[in-house]
């Protein structure tokens, strides 16, 4: 589907650095009546037990990426592999991204009358999906906040958090490519004000 095929609709690509607060922003937008399509949800579904993608992951990495006694993918173990090796990360992205894109396509086709749809895509720029969006919003916070939030959320070390942040494009590059930038380093009231202005 090309942008010219779409109905008149604001398709807002919501992206930003890992642990910058994209989900918090998306939740506020959803409360304002905007449907939110989440790439992370689609990626998790793509790697659900016994899907073709999960079988390909097990075939490549073996039982070490399976939770003990189950066929489920151990996402923490898989993350440890791909964040330590750019080649493996690229392989996984090439496996999962086409599946995620098909899910987005199907979901967008089901929402022709929605005036605004939010496409929450952490790797929007990295995956070259700008063409899917009529505008792009980048969520950012301070580097210290990002690292501390990631460590708390993922229960990881500072070194692991730094590694995961470095695996994505630098936030300054994303900001340069954004139509709008949302500063999520302050109070929740400030966040509400920014969203009200953008909508």
Swiss-Prot record:
MF GO annotations: ATP binding; dephospho-CoA kinase activity
Cysteines joined through disulfide linkages: none
Keyword Membrane: no
One annotated GO biological process: coenzyme A biosynthetic process
Gene Ontology cellular-component annotations: cytoplasm
Residues in coiled coil: none
Subcellular location: Cytoplasm
Keywords: ATP-binding, Coenzyme A biosynthesis, Cytoplasm, Kinase, Nucleotide-binding, Transferase
DPCK domain boundaries: 11-199
Pathway it works in: Cofactor biosynthesis; coenzyme A biosynthesis; CoA from (R)-pantothenate: step 5/5
Binding site for ATP: 19-24
Entry EC number(s): 2.7.1.24
Catalytic reactions on record: 3'-dephospho-CoA + ATP = ADP + CoA + H(+)
CDD domains xrefs: DPCK
One Pfam family in the UniProt entry: CoaE
Similarity comment text for this entry: Belongs to the CoaE family.
HAMAP family with a match to the protein in the record: Dephospho_CoA_kinase (MF_00376)
Function according to Swiss-Prot or TrEMBL: Catalyzes the phosphorylation of the 3'-hydroxyl group of dephosphocoenzyme A to form coenzyme A.
UniProt name for this protein: Dephospho-CoA kinase
Species: Synechococcus sp. (strain CC9902)
Name of the coding gene: coaE
């Amino acid at each position: 589907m090309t942008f010219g095929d779409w109905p008149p609709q604001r398709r807002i690509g919501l992206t930003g650095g890992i642990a910058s607060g994209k989900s918090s922003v998306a939740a506020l937008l959803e409360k304002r009546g905007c449907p939110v399509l989440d790439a992370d949800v689609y990626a998790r579904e793509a790697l659900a037990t016994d899907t073709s993608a999960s079988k390909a992951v097990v075939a490549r990495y073996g039982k070490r990426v399976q939770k003990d006694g189950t066929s489920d993918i151990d996402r923490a173990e898989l993350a440890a592999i791909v964040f330590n090796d750019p080649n493996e990360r690229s392989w996984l992205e090439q496996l999962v991204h086409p599946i995620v894109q098909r899910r987005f396509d199907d979901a967008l086709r089901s929402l022709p009358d929605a005036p605004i749809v939010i496409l929450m895509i952490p790797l929007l720029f990295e995956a070259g999906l700008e063409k899917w969006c009529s505008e792009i919003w980048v969520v950012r916070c301070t580097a210290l906040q990002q690292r501390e939030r990631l460590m708390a959320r993922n229960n990881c070390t500072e070194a692991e958090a730094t590694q995961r942040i470095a695996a994505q494009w630098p936030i300054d590059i994303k900001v340069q490519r954004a139509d709008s930038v949302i500063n999520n380093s302050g109070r929740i009231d400030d966040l509400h004000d920014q969203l009200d202005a953008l909508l």
